[in-house]
Swiss-Prot record:
Compartments where located: Nucleus
Zn finger limits (NR C4-type): 13-33, 49-73
Protein's organism: Mus musculus (Mouse)
UniProt-recorded Gene Ontology molecular function terms: chromatin binding; enzyme binding; nuclear receptor activity; phospholipid binding; RNA polymerase II cis-regulatory region sequence-specific DNA binding; transcription coregulator binding; zinc ion binding
Gene symbol of the encoding locus: Nr5a1
Name of the molecule in the record: Steroidogenic factor 1
Amino acid sequence: MDYSYDEDLDELCPVCGDKVSGYHYGLLTCESCKGFFKRTVQNNKHYTCTESQSCKIDKTQRKRCPFCRFQKCLTVGMRLEAVRADRMRGGRNKFGPMYKRDRALKQQKKAQIRANGFKLETGPPMGVPPPPPPPPDYMLPPSLHAPEPKALVSGPPSGPLGDFGAPSLPMAVPGPHGPLAGYLYPAFSNRTIKSEYPEPYASPPQQPGPPYSYPEPFSGGPNVPELILQLLQLEPEEDQVRARIVGCLQEPAKSRSDQPAPFSLLCRMADQTFISIVDWARRCMVFKELEVADQMTLLQNCWSELLVLDHIYRQVQYGKEDSILLVTGQEVELSTVAVQAGSLLHSLVLRAQELVLQLHALQLDRQEFVCLKFLILFSLDVKFLNNHSLVKDAQEKANAALLDYTLCHYPHCGDKFQQLLLCLVEVRALSMQAKEYLYHKHLGNEMPRNNLLIEMLQAKQT
């Protein structure tokens, strides 16, 4: 179903730059790109590019390379699931609430332009509170600066995190329910790890170590959608997650003097971070209403994206361009990664840093982060769900909540909602590259034994 568009507010098609004709398949596009996208999806067309898959797509050249045009349609946010498979006129009305909110806002802006006689670019609408300042660069106190980056690679760190060792995870051969079964429901004997936080507000056992504070979580305020408020309450504190992971990594070091290889240590950090993410999902509204099979299907689809987003948001808060902050609190300079981690991992880290800069410029806040996390979990791209309608409803509500929040709190940046969704496209691309890297390491027998991430990769392929 297409929605009308007010031509007074000039906007150009994000695919080719032609004049926008309305809302088509998830966003504002021109009539030509609407028809092209619809025909491509309904006819299941497969294109090839005779160049380097980077052809310029504009109004005059949009028909020269259908491959690059279709890829750009997907990149800017046109949705495959919005196209009807029965070839009837009109798309699937999945985005109606979002369209209506966006259209109402544009009507309001148009009225304000006429009343005040100025362009939108000169400032936020009258009566709207000024946007919050960009998040400050997060700096560790001098006493908490982690050991020199080389310590992570060449030997045990000298700081409070110096007793790292490979955690002894109770990993047995995956049973018929896959590697996630024991995390979601401990009744399955192949996994013995249970929820670290069985109640929404329960704290994990505190491990010894210095305090590690991040900005206080947002506790509420005017015009914050209820869904986002609920997600903020479910989001674990960073210092609690750090303390639990550090404790898990230190535990086996008490009984062994040798130190694990740096890459093995990073894999175990990722394992423990993912366990925290699974725990968050288990307590998440809607998710806990799904059958176990659907829960595992969703997590197997998005586990790598959730890990990437977790890392990205930590760097946005950290605020440094020449180093990264690990979940354990250690700082690692990018120059160290370049020298000792290999070219593949270095290129992956640099690509992630580009997204960090982009999100920092967009002033990504905690409210938007928890909403993006929820959107990744409830992806509409997942097939073979028993309760697809519940997942679809969760996705639509999260989209609407994020749109409402960005329009209300960042009125000076009218396309922030769309920009955030485009960042999710890059998160997915990064996650694909990360999985390829892990599988490359696995084929070279460089992955630690009983690694949960490799089990997730293998479960996805079976």
